[in-house]
Amino acid sequence: MSKGQVIQVMGPVVDVKFEGGNLPEIYNALVIEYKSDAEEAPTSQLTLEVAIQLGDDVVRTIAMASTDGVQRGMEVIDTGSPITVPVGTVTLGRVFNVLGNTIDLDEPLPSDIKRNKIHREAPTFDQLATTTEILETGIKVVDLLAPYLKGGKIGLFGGAGVGKTVLIQELIHNIAQEHGGISVFAGVGERTREGNDLYFEMKDSGVIEKTAMVFGQMNEPPGARMRVALTGLTIAEYFRDEEHQDVLLFIDNIFRFTQAGSEVSALLGRMPSAVGYQPTLATEMGQLQERITSTNVGSVTSIQAIYVPADDYTDPAPATTFAHLDATTNLERKLTEQGIYPAVDPLASTSRALSPDIVGEEHYEVATEVQRLLQRYKELQDIIAILGMDELSDEDKQSVSRARRVQFFLSQNFHVAEQFTGQKGSYVPVKETVKGFKDLLAGKYDHIPEDAFRSVGRIEDVLEKAKDMGVEV
């Protein structure tokens, strides 16, 4: 192992000089051990990642933690490989930082645990799975109108308090319970409070045992926030490649991954490109996204929360992400105001999988008819607001009546929200979802009150609820 010396510290950027031409490779992890002021840890260890070889035996590195206490002249050791993180079933139920160290104050991991490098090649062309298989979530609005593909990439758009976290928890719960699947959650630039809340909520709902969590919090240096997504992905890849599992990878927030990359790029002195972003934006995004895919032995399906700066979808950060997405799930605040949960906008959400070749003719026809009906209802809302329902034609009155039932039937009780709602959660298979909406569109349930359709699972639950309301079914 070659050794060097710190010659310059500029915030999270550290320059290191090595003697005798023993320069570490790009992405190699370097370690500095130094005395700390903290009583509980008299020596601190700082990990650096090599970013640029400057010449004259000097490398420029990015720190993965605070550089407080680092001085010129300190000894630096080249580990000889990129950052490695723990992988395997031992990671389930645990919380890690970017370096794969546990931060949940639980039992330490065994010393002989397997570790993988966070920088890896994407699967080769011949390893990719050629089938397009739907990932059943048990959530009606998703399965019917914007179905997810196994090994696909889904963008989850939504503001604060519209139900992103609850939707994420339910997806983790359903895949863990119904499919026995593994989930990995990567908090990228995450608020510490949000990550803390999510951990305890998942612990209470019992899904933590099937989940590995990785956090690079908002207060950490940009190097940690940029690499933490790769740490989560590396853990997920192991379950796909070695355990042959279908894995769900959540990244919140992919915009903060881009933002951290932009900060690092500026610190390294690169010339910025459009809107001040890094010139390597598309490359960095591609390196991450291309590793999230289905192979012949398993799949990594990614659900990514995406912040859109100033609601500008042409901003380079979301625009670059769009190129990689197979489906988008848009959460709408207006629906939460109506008490419709999950508040997924059925008209704005899209999916590449919604085609007759993938979901089948019947599913496709029912989904497009639902969208057509809801679009017509949206067009009529202005007229209703000004003139009232009486001014509509009989056909439009029927459309509005059915559209409202459809809208309410797209809502659903969640297992992870049982403690708040007092109502049992429901998992609805795709076949039952399609049949329920097909009968609803055909007018079979026009006599059932609208409220019977709100926050239920199967169509049988609607009929049961209607009976309780004293309606003949």
Curated annotation (Swiss-Prot):
Q: Name one GO molecular function term.
A: ATP binding
Reported EC number(s) for this entry are 7.1.2.2
- GO CC aspect terms: plasma membrane; proton-transporting ATP synthase complex
According to its UniProt record, this protein's enzyme class is translocase
- Reaction equation(s) it catalyzes: ATP + H2O + 4 H(+)(in) = ADP + phosphate + 5 H(+)(out)
Entry's CDD domains?
Answer: ATP-synt_F1_beta_C, ATP-synt_F1_beta_N, F1-ATPase_beta_CD
Positions binding ATP in this chain are: G158, G159, A160, G161, V162, G163, K164, T165
Which Pfam families does the annotation name? ATP-synt_ab, ATP-synt_ab_N, ATP-synt_VA_C
Subcellular location as annotated: Cell membrane
Keywords (A to Z) from UniProt: ATP synthesis, ATP-binding, Cell membrane, CF(1), Hydrogen ion transport, Ion transport, Membrane, Nucleotide-binding, Translocase, Transport
Report how it sits in the membrane. Answer: Peripheral membrane protein
Binding partners and assembly: F-type ATPases have 2 components, CF(1) - the catalytic core - and CF(0) - the membrane proton channel. CF(1) has five subunits: alpha(3), beta(3), gamma(1), delta(1), epsilon(1). CF(0) has three main subunits: a(1), b(2) and c(9-12). The alpha and beta chains form an alternating ring which encloses part of the gamma chain. CF(1) is attached to CF(0) by a central stalk formed by the gamma and epsilon chains, while a peripheral stalk is formed by the delta and b chains.
Q: What does this protein do?
A: Produces ATP from ADP in the presence of a proton gradient across the membrane. The catalytic sites are hosted primarily by the beta subunits.
Q: Which family does the UniProt entry place this protein in?
A: Belongs to the ATPase alpha/beta chains family.
HAMAP family reported in the protein's UniProt record: ATP_synth_beta_bact
The protein in question is named ATP synthase subunit beta 2
Origin organism of this chain? Listeria innocua serovar 6a (strain ATCC BAA-680 / CLIP 11262)
Record gene name: atpD2
